[in-house]
Regions:
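Charged, amphipathic alpha-helical segments and their flanking helix caps
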Residues: 1-24, 28-30, 43-128
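A short, hydrophobic beta-strand-centered structural micro-motif
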Residues: 34-44
């Protein structure tokens, strides 16, 4: 499963950036980036093996970030991102997508006043 996490991250970026109305970043936005924007990152992952196949079960965070006083903008942007991501057809070279679904959501305001609204997505792929 060489380079499988890189391929999965690239597939998520391609899916989101191809349809989103805001900038999309992996891990974190660049300093000075203009909100609102979307950020995704791998939270955790495990390798799964059966008798003759291998795959990955991973959890990815997807969130919208806004610098508005209230969370409305972040909620609206996240709803758009969620509609793209939920059951989105990720194309991962050498793998078959088994599942791409949200399991939970979150909302908070950080110490700098930025709103973070998002969800945790379970993505499962297996070698083709």
């Amino acid at each position: 499963m060489a380079n499988d996490y890189t391929a999965l991250g690239s597939a998520i970026y391609s899916l989101l950036s191809g349809a989103a109305t805001v900038s999309i970043y992996n891990q974190r936005a660049p300093q000075g980036g203009t909100p609102p924007y979307g950020i995704f990152n791998r939270q955790s992952a495990i390798d799964e093996r059966t008798f003759n196949t291998a795959g990955i079960s991973s959890d990815y965070v997807l969130k919208a970030v806004s610098n508005r006083v209230w969370p409305g903008e972040a909620k609206e942007v996240y709803q758009g991102l969620h509609s793209i991501m939920q059951d989105g057809a990720l194309s991962v070279s050498g793998f078959v997508l088994l599942r791409n679904q949200r399991g939970s959501t979150f909302e908070y305001q950080d110490a700098d006043g930025f709103w973070h609204v998002g969800g945790l997505y379970r993505i499962e792929i297996e070698e083709s």
